[in-house]
Amino acid sequence: MDRRRFIKGSMAMAAVCGTSGIASLFSQAAFAADSDIADGQTQRFDFSILQSMAHDLAQTAWRGAPRPLPDTLATMTPQAYNSIQYDAEKSLWHNVENRQLDAQFFHMGMGFRRRVRMFSVDPATHLAREIHFRPELFKYNDAGVDTKQLEGQSDLGFAGFRVFKAPELARRDVVSFLGASYFRAVDDTYQYGLSARGLAIDTYTDSKEEFPDFTAFWFDTVKPGATTFTVYALLDSASITGAYKFTIHCEKSQVIMDVENHLYARKDIKQLGIAPMTSMFSCGTNERRMCDTIHPQIHDSDRLSMWRGNGEWICRPLNNPQKLQFNAYTDNNPKGFGLLQLDRDFSHYQDIMGWYNKRPSLWVEPRNKWGKGTIGLMEIPTTGETLDNIVCFWQPEKAVKAGDEFAFQYRLYWSAQPPVHCPLARVMATRTGMGGFPEGWAPGEHYPEKWARRFAVDFVGGDLKAAAPKGIEPVITLSSGEAKQIEILYIEPIDGYRIQFDWYPTSDSTDPVDMRMYLRCQGDAISETWLYQYFPPAPDKRQYVDDRVMS
């Protein structure tokens, strides 16, 4: 496993994979390959042609690393790169009457070394024409770019694209595809957060992780007044190729993406990740180790939520562990899963730079049968908010062999809340802290004699209030240790119930403790299932140190 670090901001999604063999296949498919932007040549395109292109590409050898950039682009700083602006007067759909959407392209440079080709498609005639790079499309401002080095570089390509929505047609984008196969979107706050990817390969194996690239995009010309657009993408990497169709709905309060892909394996793949997403969790109510700042919480997402094929709802709060952790949750035809950011209260973050209270959740809804597999969750130790350390994806049970073909359909919801909710009581928050003392005496006149860790899980909604007179029973399962001092407390401000218990070790082991809890009433489950992974300290650290100076 090669541990990855994802730098946020302009460096967040730098392409790290090799160059594609797309050029020869374009000519085979009779696409315009001429570098002359003024030749006006058009060629037929539709999704079936793209699938054939991806299939044929998989039969050829991957061509490795991208070619070098001109020096003036290769040596750019993030600040210089961010100062380059696309000329809004030359946007993709600038001439569409009553346009509600528009698209601009990202410049090559810095860590963005992979050439991405762009094509405009007339959806009525299915004719496509390539959009070639030229310096006149951009405003270089104070980036310090020597544009003389770019003259005649019509095949330089672009790094990616972003889409804007009225009334912010040139100021605030709502969708962005940039670097490798990364992409992201916003809700009505216009605040970016976590990212998705086209595909993940060998994220947690003994092989180096592979990052496929989107190497070309085809844009259907948007219709007048429309807030939905369609873009097609060709994916390429050493082990696999793919044809993707994104139908993207830029709604008032959310962005919804309908994704269809057709994948063609070049090689055997140890771990194939479908609908992968990448996020950041530094600290939160349950994990305080890295919260020695003025900010009470720092995270893009606070939990993994899963709606299993059997109907069970699971809430798994995220962690920032001291050692890399990978967990796989078995399922059969999952109904949905996602990394959610449900705490939207500014006072819980106190961050006027990151605005974590405004960051969207991302929910995956399979649209065809995915069969058996696992939802994988990787949590990487991180020292702060600039490194993405959370990865989640679906891994099919069937091993991937060279020559295999797959097709997946799913819908992505970028929104403040997921489109579906557990009808039972839901986990609102998880808190941890010192245990071993009666609640209300924290910790009293002296520290507890016996070390313990306290867990408090707040549940809201569902039939909790109706169940209370009949008796609410927490069902707690631990992989090691004991749960004691279990309490059920009504919390009036949230109109919910807190289940509180202390965990006591029964051995010196420092292996992660898997915890599972749900609520039931008269034998029936009345809540979603809470899953947690706790990392106990070494035996010599299981003590309370009174460092008070009394004289």
From Swiss-Prot:
<dbReference type="InterPro" id="IPR014718">
    <property type="entry name" value="GH-type_carb-bd"/>
</dbReference>
<dbReference type="Pfam" id="PF04349">
    <property type="entry name" value="MdoG"/>
</dbReference>
<dbReference type="GO" id="GO:0030246">
    <property type="term" value="F:carbohydrate binding"/>
</dbReference>
<keyword id="KW-0574">Periplasm</keyword>
<comment type="similarity">
    <text>Belongs to the OpgD/OpgG family.</text>
</comment>
<dbReference type="GO" id="GO:0051274">
    <property type="term" value="P:beta-glucan biosynthetic process"/>
</dbReference>
<keyword id="KW-0732">Signal</keyword>
<dbReference type="InterPro" id="IPR013783">
    <property type="entry name" value="Ig-like_fold"/>
</dbReference>
<dbReference type="InterPro" id="IPR014756">
    <property type="entry name" value="Ig_E-set"/>
</dbReference>
<dbReference type="InterPro" id="IPR007444">
    <property type="entry name" value="Glucan_biosyn_MdoG_C"/>
</dbReference>
<dbReference type="InterPro" id="IPR023724">
    <property type="entry name" value="Glucan_biosyn_MdoD"/>
</dbReference>
<dbReference type="InterPro" id="IPR019546">
    <property type="entry name" value="TAT_signal_bac_arc"/>
</dbReference>
<dbReference type="InterPro" id="IPR011013">
    <property type="entry name" value="Gal_mutarotase_sf_dom"/>
</dbReference>
<comment type="function">
    <text>Probably involved in the control of the structural glucose backbone of osmoregulated periplasmic glucans (OPGs).</text>
</comment>
<dbReference type="InterPro" id="IPR006311">
    <property type="entry name" value="TAT_signal"/>
</dbReference>
<comment type="pathway">
    <text>Glycan metabolism; osmoregulated periplasmic glucan (OPG) biosynthesis.</text>
</comment>
<dbReference type="InterPro" id="IPR014438">
    <property type="entry name" value="Glucan_biosyn_MdoG/MdoD"/>
</dbReference>
<dbReference type="GO" id="GO:0003824">
    <property type="term" value="F:catalytic activity"/>
</dbReference>
<feature type="signal peptide" description="Tat-type signal">
    <location>
        <begin position="1"/>
        <end position="32"/>
    </location>
</feature>
<dbReference type="GO" id="GO:0030288">
    <property type="term" value="C:outer membrane-bounded periplasmic space"/>
</dbReference>
<protein>
    <recommendedName>
        <fullName>Glucans biosynthesis protein D</fullName>
    </recommendedName>
</protein>
